[in-house]
Amino acid sequence: MTGGISPHPINATPEIQEITNTVKEQLEKKLGTNYSIFQAISYKKQLVNGMNYFIKVKTDNGYDHIRVYEAFKGTPNLVSVQQHKSLEDDITYF
């Protein structure tokens, strides 16, 4: 059953870091930058026809929130990004 975004952030797992690593190059291309620091911190998720992951990522420039869509039998793809976030900023739907 599909639904809203999970209410509370979950600490990033190795699986979430792997998803984050998969879209790193997509994000770097989109923003025209290269990251030496790219660490998933926490995330929320939303079940759709696949899974949306809303991931807080620590980067060289602070924190970004990225939205990644992964089809049930597909490859994760970057959907959007919110830059200039802080560690304290809540992860919300975007």
UniProtKB/Swiss-Prot annotation:
Xref: Gene3D superfamilies: 3.10.450.10
Localization: Cytoplasm
GO CC annotation: cytosol
Motif Secondary area of contact positions after renumbering to this chain: 46-50
Site (Reactive site): G3
Matching SUPFAM superfamilies: Cystatin/monellin
Pfam families hit by this protein: Cystatin
InterPro entries hit by this protein: Cystatin_dom, Cystatin_sf, Prot_inh_stefin
GO MF, one annotated term: cysteine-type endopeptidase inhibitor activity
Keyword Nucleus: no
Keywords linked to the UniProt accession: Cytoplasm, Protease inhibitor, Thiol protease inhibitor
Source superkingdom: Eukaryota
Any GO BP: hyperosmotic response
CDD domains from the UniProt entry: CY
Annotated family: Belongs to the cystatin family.
Function according to Swiss-Prot or TrEMBL: Intracellular thiol proteinase inhibitor.
Protein name (record): Cystatin-A3
